[in-house]
Amino acid sequence: MSGLGRSRRGGRSRVDQEERFPQGLWTGVAMRSCPEEQYWDPLLGTCMSCKTICNHQSQRTCAAFCRSLSCRKEQGKFYDHLLRDCISCASICGQHPKQCAYFCENKLRSPVNLPPELRRQRSGEVENNSDNSGRYQGLEHRGSEASPALPGLKLSADQVALVYSTLGLCLCAVLCCFLVAVACFLKKRGDPCSCQPRSRPRQSPAKSSQDHAMEAGSPVSTSPEPVETCSFCFPECRAPTQESAVTPGTPDPTCAGRWGCHTRTTVLQPCPHIPDSGLGIVCVPAQEGGPGA
């Protein structure tokens, strides 16, 4: 009796346990104890990896894990466990989680691969940065007196050509003025001084003596009169020289009218006065070998 009672009690206990905890609940409790990437196998009574059944078309136990595994294999996507969906990283770059950090950093470096939204956002940031930098440079230029030009002022090609051509003309004008000044300086330095009196041409002694004789023979206020010349006029005017002592008859001095007689030894002897007449006589020494010899 006791055994039957025990068996009944045991049977009741098992039945009660089965009623209280059906088979599905037991498996659920077992699956709860398994990690996320594993599932509970009721036949083997242990946790198995979900990777072995992800390739099958119909999987119920590891559906979430298999979906996350396939999402990780795709580049630029990650699996959101809250939404239980695969999300592209390109649509959330800038506010991306750590799973999309590598993808978003590479995409930001190459703006060609960015989506249009990110391109617009980035272009707007670049424009804002350029405006801020332009304003900063404008403040610097306004603060400095040396460069009063407006910020962002750009000259066209025609204006640049006009500026350079004007500078070239100014440089040419300065160079021409310098060359003209140098030429005038060299010319002035090479010319003699105009203040110095010009030297008179020297006359031959014969011509000068003849001029003096003509001036002496003719009065100053009257016109010049004809003059005769002779070789041996007034022999008493001749000065004795060594040649005349040896060979007489070869006189050498010059006698000009009423002027003194000049010899080779530069001795002056008075000539006799000639009575006033219409003709003035000028004595010229005879040359050796001439008709007077």
Curated annotation (Swiss-Prot):
Membrane topology: Single-pass type III membrane protein
GO annotation, cellular component aspect: plasma membrane
Mapped TNFR-Cys repeat ranges: 33-67, 70-104
Membrane-spanning parts: 166-186
Residue spans of biased composition, Polar residues class: 126-135
Glycosylation positions in this chain: N128
Subcellular location(s) per record: Membrane
Disulphide linkage map: C34-C47, C50-C62, C54-C66, C71-C86, C89-C100, C93-C104
Main localization of the protein described in the UniProt heading: membrane
Cytoplasmic side, ranges: 187-293
Region (Disordered): 115-146, 192-226
Extracellular side: 1-165
InterPro entries: TACI_Cys-rich-dom (IPR015384), TNFR_13B (IPR022317)
Disulfide bond found in the keyword field: yes
GO molecular function per UniProt: signaling receptor activity
Any Gene Ontology biological process: adaptive immune response
Domain of life: Eukaryota
Tissue: Highly expressed in spleen, thymus, small intestine and peripheral blood leukocytes. Expressed in resting B-cells and activated T-cells, but not in resting T-cells.
Keywords: Adaptive immunity, Disease variant, Disulfide bond, Glycoprotein, Immunity, Membrane, Receptor, Repeat, Signal-anchor, Transmembrane, Transmembrane helix
Keyword presence, Ligase: no
Family matches, as Pfam families: TACI-CRD2 (PF09305)
PANTHER family: TUMOR NECROSIS FACTOR RECEPTOR SUPERFAMILY MEMBER 13B
Associated pathology: Immunodeficiency, common variable, 2: A primary immunodeficiency characterized by antibody deficiency, hypogammaglobulinemia, recurrent bacterial infections and an inability to mount an antibody response to antigen. The defect results from a failure of B-cell differentiation and impaired secretion of immunoglobulins; the numbers of circulating B-cells is usually in the normal range, but can be low. Immunoglobulin A deficiency 2: Selective deficiency of immunoglobulin A (IGAD) is the most common form of primary immunodeficiency, with an incidence of approximately 1 in 600 individuals in the western world. Individuals with symptomatic IGAD often have deficiency of IgG subclasses or decreased antibody response to carbohydrate antigens such as pneumococcal polysaccharide vaccine. Individuals with IGAD also suffer from recurrent sinopulmonary and gastrointestinal infections and have an increased incidence of autoimmune disorders and of lymphoid and non-lymphoid malignancies.
Subunit composition and interactions: Binds TRAF2, TRAF5 and TRAF6. Binds the NH2-terminal domain of CAMLG with its C-terminus.
Cited function: Receptor for TNFSF13/APRIL and TNFSF13B/TALL1/BAFF/BLYS that binds both ligands with similar high affinity. Mediates calcineurin-dependent activation of NF-AT, as well as activation of NF-kappa-B and AP-1. Involved in the stimulation of B- and T-cell function and the regulation of humoral immunity.
Protein name: Tumor necrosis factor receptor superfamily member 13B
